[in-house]
């Protein structure tokens, strides 16, 4: 399907939109000027600066709260205003989803709080962020977050507890 002329023409027309053009242009420049030398976090910050983004939404997993705190400090030090929302926002017990004890991490559905990626997205939408960063949301939770988030977003890191958050490691 990537060779269909109609699809490629529609794709190029999409870049005529001011926001799409700015994102594509600054992404290409960020890639060119940091290729192989800048970390993902540095690339994200350079990209956000070049796009003029200031108010940054940050959706993260509670399991990476220490890392999220460090990332927040770095972003703020570099001039960004950070609005963060943890996955456990709302503090709703997993029983609300119909989850039973046998299907929980610790065996107590009534005391285990569900992740709320829809809540993360809606909170960031309501905060009118310029740009958003997602870090470490569970598989499926990331899907719901992306489905409900209205603004542009990038992924800083995905969670993989087995590989130290490097999910491609097993294929090398």
Task: Kindly give the residue locations of the regions a language model identified.
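Electropositive, gly/pro-rich neighborhoods at or near active sites that engage anionic ligands
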Residues: 1-55, 62-66
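Short, flexible loop segments at the rims of nucleotide/cofactor-binding pockets, characterized by
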Residues: 32-36, 107-113, 131-132
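Gly/Ser/Thr-rich loops at beta-strand to alpha-helix junctions
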Residues: 34-38, 60-68, 90, 132-143
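Active-site glycine-rich loop that binds ribose-phosphate moieties when present
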Residues: 39, 111-126, 137-139
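Short glycine-rich or small-residue beta-strand-to-loop segments that form or flank ligand, phosphate
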Residues: 48, 53-62, 84-88, 131-135
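Long, charge-dense
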Residues: 66-117
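Short Gly/Thr/Asp-enriched flexible loops that form oxyanion-binding sites at enzyme active sites
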Residues: 67-74, 142-151
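Short, flexible loop segments at boundaries between secondary-structure elements
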Residues: 150-172
């Amino acid at each position: 399907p990537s060779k269909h002329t109609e699809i490629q023409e529609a794709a190029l027309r999409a870049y005529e939109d001011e926001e799409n053009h700015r994102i594509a242009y600054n992404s290409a420049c960020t890639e060119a000027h940091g290729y192989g030398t800048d970390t993902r976090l540095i690339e994200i910050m350079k990209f956000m600066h070049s796009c003029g983004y200031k108010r940054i939404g940050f959706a993260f997993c509670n399991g990476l709260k220490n890392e999220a705190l460090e990332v927040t400090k770095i972003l703020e030090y570099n001039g960004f205003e950070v609005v963060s929302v943890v996955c456990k926002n709302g503090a709703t017990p997993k029983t609300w989803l119909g989850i039973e004890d046998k299907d929980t991490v610790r065996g107590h559905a009534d005391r285990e709080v569900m992740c709320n990626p829809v809540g993360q997205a809606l909170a960031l939408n309501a905060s009118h962020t310029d740009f958003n960063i997602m870090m470490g949301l569970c598989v499926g939770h990331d899907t719901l977050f992306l489905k409900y988030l209205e603004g542009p977003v990038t992924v800083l890191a995905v969670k993989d507890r087995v590989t130290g958050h490097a999910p491609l490691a097993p294929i090398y």
